[in-house]
Amino acid sequence: MPFKNLPTGSAAPLASLVEARPGQVSSRSLTRIGDPLAATLLAFAEGESVSGETYAGDTLYYLVEGKAEVNAVQMTAGDVLKVPAGTPHAVRPVPAAKILQLSLI
């Protein structure tokens, strides 16, 4: 399972790898489709969110930058939260955030 879209010659801040765009949630996949682990870096613009997400495997959210709520759990930069497999959940930035999402497939 090789990673993709990551720097190899020099280090870079994780938050610099994806930029929020007004009116959307931007994403950068760090693994390939079909891998047993889906790693995605998400950038939420102010006012954007996702709801009704459910994954077959456990999902880990690591807040890279900003503040957010995952199922009403408050998170700040550096926080991590596990959402168990099959649990419907929503992600809402307060007001904008960058999040690393790791999901077991």
Predicted regions located by residue number:
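Ligand-binding loop in jelly-roll beta-barrel domains
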Residues: 74-76, 85-105
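A short, N-terminal "cap"/entry segment at the start of jelly-roll beta-barrel domains
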Residues: 1-40, 71
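Glycine- and acidic-residue-biased ligand/ion/polar-headgroup-sensing regions
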Residues: 56-70
